[in-house]
Amino acid sequence: SEPSHRKEVVDDAVMEEIRGYVAAQYSDPELNVSVIAEKWNLSLSSLSRKYRAKMGHGLLDEIHMARLKEAHQLLAEGSTVKETAEKVGYLEARALVRAFKRYEGVVPSQLKGK
């Protein structure tokens, strides 16, 4: 017989749902892995582990990458680093600068000429 406790089911469809949610909500500064875990009623550790296993990178990375993708566009259009940071969900310009350094090895000012 089946065990009475409900096993957390995190299948590909759920991962894609979460990825879509991040793509739609990345500009919310409150968005983080805990918020997502709670929304899908999953434990933080389980969600993090399963997301990384399925997607090849962490859920927090997914959030940062979505923000940086939009930041590239805004910076290319002439937005300041401060304006861009606020529009893509970072509370401070330096958080955007840190994310660029971490994920792309450059600072936003190095992108201006590209």
Show where each model-derived region lies.
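Short, Lys/Arg-enriched, Trp-marked, Pro/Gly-tolerant hinge/linker segments that flank
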Residues: 1-17, 40, 53-65
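Basic, amphipathic alpha-helical hairpins
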Residues: 1-5, 17-31, 51-55, 72-80, ...
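Basic/polar phosphate-binding segments, predominantly the helix-turn-helix DNA-binding elements
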Residues: 34-62, 86-107
